[in-house]
């Protein structure tokens, strides 16, 4: 297949705020579908380049934005690793809605969402809020949902974590990071891979992927305490059964993860997520665990 404008990086998208949002796009000739990626915490959309180029060669257009506080967007807004001063999670959701509407205005294609790690929660929450409403806002219906490297925690678990994050926000300041929160969130992830080659071995079994992550200035930085508070508030809203039941029950959904992913406790969390989505009423949920794979399967 001949590729036309196969890769366009750092496309500015005005938000009406200081700085710009930026997204990346991989476009084949005559695309038959559109995959939109919501990336994870402390990374950025351009990391999905090789995956996107592969899909583009198969006729699928791929887009991936850099969230607030992340990648070129965070750099442009002078807020790297700080999502917002308040209501950051809601702003991430609204950003995705506006970006999808913007891209759809030029490409009327079936839309599949792929969310990785934090982005998987963002994609689920997006489907709760906007799946039925998008068609009334000059945007596409969502045709499929893919969740990578995800997990499940009960609302009570997230509430307990939020109390600690709020204390750290009071102690450190809203726009500062917290070593305690970082250790609580990521500190044990490498334990299963000792003796570890790096502190980021849990990311992938592919040494090149890990090394690129470590050397990338837009990866691995600690979020601010306010960003943690906003994220955890979003998790509380997302994970109760009443909220999950708002996702289109017929939406085809695929969960995949590494069988050794510490984020989901070696697949336990993503299995719980599948069961919870099914219990909430979703009738078309599949799951696959990749043997030997880690967080980025």
PLM-predicted stretches and their roles:
Residues 115-119, 123:
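Gly/Ala-rich beta-loop-alpha elbow adjacent to hydrolase catalytic centers
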Residues 123-218:
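Alpha/beta-hydrolase-fold enzymes
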Residues 262-272:
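Conserved alpha/beta-hydrolase "acid-adjacent" motif
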Residues 84-104:
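Alpha/beta-hydrolase active-site loop
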